[in-house]
Amino acid sequence: MLDYIYPEEEQRFFTNREYTLALLGLSRDLLGQGVRKHLALSGFRRVGKTVVLKEFLRRHLETNRGGDCRLTYMDLPRLALTPEGFAVQYVGYLLYWLAGDLHQRVESFFDAPAQLATSGQMGAAFSEHVVRLHQELQKEKPDQHLLLELAFNTPEVYAQTAGKRVIVILDEFPEILALDNYPQIHDVLALFRAVLQAQSRVVYVVAGSMNGLMERIFLDAASPLFVHFQLETIGPFGREDCDALVRKRLSMLADPVPGDVLAAIYQVTRGHPFYVYATAMRVIENISLLNKPLASATVQEAFTLETLGSTGRIYNLCRYVLEQSLQGVRGETMPQAVLQVLAQQPAGMTLTEIAARLKRPSGAIRQVLTWLADVDLVEQREDKTYGYRDPVLQLWVAYYYSGLQLTGIPSQKVLSNLVAELMEKYERVANELGLAKESQVRELLEAFNGQEVDGRLFGVDSPVKLPVFERVTSYLSPDGQVQVDSVAETSDAENHERWAVEIKWRGRLSGKKELEKLAANARSRSAKPWFISKMGFTQEALEFARHNDMLLSSQADLEVLAKLVGT
């Protein structure tokens, strides 16, 4: 079954995610000690959430298969979304993983005789539990609420009967909300919480692709699951991990892979694993079939063909994301109009600007923007402008609605012109979003190596000795209240140092309020705050920084610093 859900190719190209794997391992180890730590993983589609879950499952089966902790995995979109069908298939997946025979197909556990026969060999109390569920199913009008309650409690009954612990992994967890459409259920999350709270030997690890929806489920105080899960974001790779993945993908072409090729792939993909995969595969095709050189220009051509070509993997993922997202939005005409307008504005637009451009009332446009934010297509930024969450999707939408679609391989002249145009637009989008700078700053932090530099580059008088950071990541607190662009930490236990870094790449001076927010977030992490602003700072902000031991840098400072450390 593992090879069926986690193909050998995916296993071979798995890269890093060691922090997330360690967190999953910690949850498992704590469960063994009777402490339950539920986890929720959020991230864009195809960013790697499912792969890291399967890699955790694979490693567990290899090293702890006979231990006291049993792992189960199910992809909720594959389950029937009627209460009766869901309950039967939910229990079927659990039986498949818990019965210990992974050589059968999971579908063989979906019928009543198989479930009753299998559970009959797993202890009397557990068998009685499964029998009770099927007795309820035999009724003319089954109690749907009871069926789900019995299904959700199945792993706990097994754990109590067998003296085991169970981790239940639920991929694409928000799909469960479809059960709210049944009057007897009404609020499936409340039911799920009630069962979860009564359990003691089961831990849940869930994942979902709609960041906004995942945040509402796990961080909104009105949600039944508020504070029950630690929400972790799975983001794109940093430069080092992106390079490692590219080396694996392109090993058939060159070893080592040229540095300019590594840099070009990171530049166009921003480290998104699926975009890396798609671009690398097109590079292999273009070199193998069209005799292209292994160079940065070939990477840019590959990315352009993948993004604008109707057979491109990135093109089809973007189209899928758009179509799936708009299915959840009432009436597609106005949402599409808003998306088209926003696609042309890398810096984003305010509500008033969008309403004026479309000649519609602000109230109606606000409602559309709320819908689009709910399905993760757009976001409202700190400066109150709206824009796309994903610069690649923004670029694709701009070309898609303009009618440009490549149905074959264009001539070299046409392709070269398209590449130049697309790269210029893409860089403009990424730079306006600050995404390019965020990744560059992380690279910069990783290049710190004890160098001593002029303190004026950080807004202070005395020289600054740059720490040697062991780990550089973005940070989102479990309750969603504290978010920092980058947190960098040293590994020296005696002289441990941690920096909290915020980047604002907008066309205005950064003010005192923005610095106050970073200072508070840095204090919560016991970190030194470093604020980077493209345009610099107001006088009030400079005074605040001086009195609060903050480091400040402008675009010019950052450029000098990058040259000094060699990035």
Q: What are the residue ranges of the model-derived segments?
A:
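Winged-helix-like regulatory helical subdomains adjacent to P-loop NTPase cores
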Residues: 271, 275-360
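Domain-level recognition of nuclease-like catalytic cores that cleave nucleotide substrates
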Residues: 103-128, 530-567
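P-loop NTPase nucleotide-binding core
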Residues: 37-38, 44-47, 51-167, 176-182, ...
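Walker A/P-loop-proximal flanking segment of P-loop NTPase domains
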Residues: 1-47, 51-64
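Sensor-1/coupling segment of RecA-like P-loop NTPase cores
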Residues: 160-162, 166-169, 175-221
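Helix-loop-helix "sensor" segment of P-loop NTPases
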Residues: 216-267
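Conserved catalytic cores of phosphodiester-cleaving nucleases, focusing on short active-site segments
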Residues: 445, 471, 480-511, 515-520, ...
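Short, amphipathic alpha-helical interaction segments positioned at domain boundaries
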Residues: 391-422
